[in-house]
């Protein structure tokens, strides 16, 4: 179902402009969650060596996450102190286009627009359910999904609705998180690529989980696919040909972008954090124990695992972020060694299989001795590769900011409890720390400024200025409604 208000339909921009906006090529913008459809968390805009708080915006109510936390332990697998794997809505994550910052609220069901210079609220728009994931901005439009089961397209300038589509198959409502929500909430964000808006609706596989493609200008449905085995929760990712759908605590689903047909479910340990580290090379996690799984383009089995919460990939460097450490790796060398190690392990498995067959048929001792010798040689090679992988470390520092990590120019910005930090990417030197109100789960970088979102509903803006203004959302501003 599409509802439209044609007077607010802006003119269509050229296709090349959509590509630039959606994939983060416009240097000053951060138009979607973690900057681009790969969720890279990287901006080319540098941050000043010293920053000050320019303004802070306070919500009247803190975020209301859909999931309060992970179970304390997995008795069957004897895993204790499990990591939370569904943390996508613990803060109001900000996106930035031009001089405007946009975010959704899980507390009051609104989409907000702020002036990035002053923090003043410019407009807001009501949906009929919590808005748990950040909007996406493209071609002068703001796209966002809500727990009410709808995808909305708004005018980025004034918040007027352009169209809204019921992504859910019906308007059935159910109790959820103390609210009345759609039986098919939109909890995967909206991805814009090549004039198409992609979204999902549904988190109960037995009810059907819908993946759909819409015309980004008109909202017309292009295709719809339904899966009945996995949920859809977490930020969608898009490559040139594929869509990646985080599945909450389960492993991501890979689909064809042209048709929505499933390609595979990847192997791993689940979680809603995901990154495309070049092409279709996927990193995701954090699993039950805080592990990131790395898969290359094509194979479904793991290439490597890393102990960490998030990863930044920039050129030949990878920055790995864990609960206690931040480190930089020589990415190219590390991955080649990981490939070699994987190949050696595969050869070991084949030889061990051959030895078992010889044992079963009482094979000759000389043949067994030859295979055992080959196995020992492979063990030496494997140890050498493992040692070389450890030597790929460029630097490592203790880190008390484990909640989020982005890269702006040559500065890594990390969020922690009541504090954010700037770290020099080249050598790990801590440049500055600044206090914030609450746990800093979200950081956006644009135009030399950092926008930090916390779990108490605050949004802090830091830039190279001494200006400060503490702002509360105005109570008299007229709200837009569907």
At which residue positions do the language-model features occur?
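Repeat-blade elements of multi-bladed beta-propeller folds
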Residues: 30-34, 83-111, 128-152, 179-212, ...
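Surface-exposed acidic, glycine/proline-enriched linker/cap segments
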Residues: 67-84, 170-189, 223, 241, ...
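Short loop/turn segments that connect beta-strands within beta-propeller blades
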Residues: 115-118, 155-158, 215-218, 256-259, ...
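Blade/loop signatures of beta-propeller domains
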Residues: 29-75, 165-167, 210, 373-385, ...
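Beta-propeller domains
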Residues: 48, 55-59, 106-117
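A short beta-strand motif characteristic of beta-propeller blades
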Residues: 55, 78-83, 120-125, 163, ...
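N-terminal secretory signal peptides that target proteins for export/translocation
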Residues: 1-11
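Bacterial N-terminal signal peptides
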Residues: 14-24
């Amino acid at each position: 179902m599409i509802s439209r208000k044609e007077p607010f339909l802006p003119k269509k921009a050229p296709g090349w402009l959509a590509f630039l906006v959606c994939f983060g090529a416009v240097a000053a913008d951060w138009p979607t969650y973690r900057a681009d459809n790969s969720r890279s968390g990287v901006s080319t805009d540098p941050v000043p060596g010293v920053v000050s708080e320019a303004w802070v915006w306070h919500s009247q109510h803190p975020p209301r996450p859909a999931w309060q936390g992970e179970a304390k332990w997995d008795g069957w697998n004897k895993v204790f102190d499990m990591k939370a794997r569904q943390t996508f809505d613990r803060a109001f994550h900000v996106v930035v286009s031009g001089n405007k910052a946009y975010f959704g609220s899980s507390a009051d069901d609104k989409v907000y627009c702020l002036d990035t210079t002053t923090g003043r609220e410019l407009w807001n728009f009501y949906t009929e359910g919590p808005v748990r994931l950040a909007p996406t901005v493209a071609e002068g439009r703001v796209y966002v999904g809500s727990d009410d089961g709808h995808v909305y397209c708004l005018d980025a300038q004034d918040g007027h609705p352009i169209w809204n589509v019921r992504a859910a198959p019906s308007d059935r409502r159910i109790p959820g998180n103390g609210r009345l929500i759609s039986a098919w909430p939109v909890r995967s964000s909206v991805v814009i690529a090549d004039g198409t808006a992609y979204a999902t609706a549904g988190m109960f596989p037995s009810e059907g989980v819908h993946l759909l493609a819409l015309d980004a200008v008109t909202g017309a449905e292009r295709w719809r696919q339904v899966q009945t085995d996995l949920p859809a929760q977490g930020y969608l990712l898009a490559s040139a040909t594929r869509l990646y759908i985080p599945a909450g605590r389960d492993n991501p689903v890979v689909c064809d972008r042209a048709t929505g047909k499933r390609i595979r479910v990847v192997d791993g340990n689940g979680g809603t954090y995901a990154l495309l580290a070049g092409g279709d090379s996927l990193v995701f996690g954090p699993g039950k124990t805080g592990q990131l799984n790395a898969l290359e383009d094509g194979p479904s089995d793991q290439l490597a695992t890393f102990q960490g919460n998030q990863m930044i990939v920039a050129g030949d460097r990878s920055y790995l972020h864990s609960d206690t450490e931040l480190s930089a790796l020589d990415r190219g060398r590390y991955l080649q060694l990981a490939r070699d190690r994987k190949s050696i392990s595969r050869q070991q498995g084949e030889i061990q299989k051959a030895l078992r067959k010889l044992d079963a048929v009482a094979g000759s001792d000389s043949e067994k001795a030859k295979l055992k010798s080959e196995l020992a040689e492979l063990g030496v090679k494997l140890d050498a590769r493992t040692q070389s992988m450890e030597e790929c470390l460029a630097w490592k520092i203790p880190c008390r900011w484990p909640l989020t990590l982005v890269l702006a120019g040559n500065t890594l910005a990390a969020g922690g409890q009541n504090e954010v930090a700037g770290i020099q990417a080249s050598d790990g030197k801590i440049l500055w720390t600044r206090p914030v109100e609450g746990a800093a789960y979200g950081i956006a970088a644009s135009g030399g400024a950092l926008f930090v979102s916390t779990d108490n509903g605050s949004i802090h803006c830091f830039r190279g200025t001494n200006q400060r203004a503490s702002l509360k959302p105005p109570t008299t501003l007229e709200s837009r409604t569907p």
